[in-house]
């Protein structure tokens, strides 16, 4: 889980559980990609990091580019691409949060029933 604190500057915290241990750490202000420890081998995680670095170098991290990355990144393997389908285990959804001076935008796409929801929280009048 990632926690973002906008009230005390911009601070990111990462809460990880690897199936055995829980860890909380403060993150630096740079880009990160996460892969569920119980679901992916170290080799699969390295591939995902490679795809993420490639995105940064070729398209950058706009909201549109990141959403497209979550839909399409991979090499055609339903076992370890960003959208997985291992039969019994499938990617359920894609969520995105965008913060601007005026609002916080949250979008949620249910990949199972193809529903898309978008909500806004106005930050300043």
Please place each PLM-identified region on the residue numbering.
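N-terminal nucleophile
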Residues: 1-125
């Amino acid at each position: 889980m990632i926690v973002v604190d906008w009230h005390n500057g911009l601070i990111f915290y990462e809460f990880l559980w690897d199936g055995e241990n829980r860890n909380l750490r403060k993150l630096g202000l740079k880009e990160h990609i996460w892969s569920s420890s119980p679901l992916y081998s170290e080799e699969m995680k390295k591939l995902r990091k490679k795809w993420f670095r490639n995105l940064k170098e070729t398209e950058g991290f706009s909201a549109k580019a990141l959403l497209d990355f979550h839909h399409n990144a991979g090499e055609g393997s339903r076992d370890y691409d960003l959208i997985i389908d291992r039969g019994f285990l499938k990617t359920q959804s894609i969520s995105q949060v965008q913060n601007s001076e005026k609002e916080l935008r949250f979008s949620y796409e249910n990949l199972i029933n193809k529903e898309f929801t978008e909500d806004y929280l106005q930050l300043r009048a």
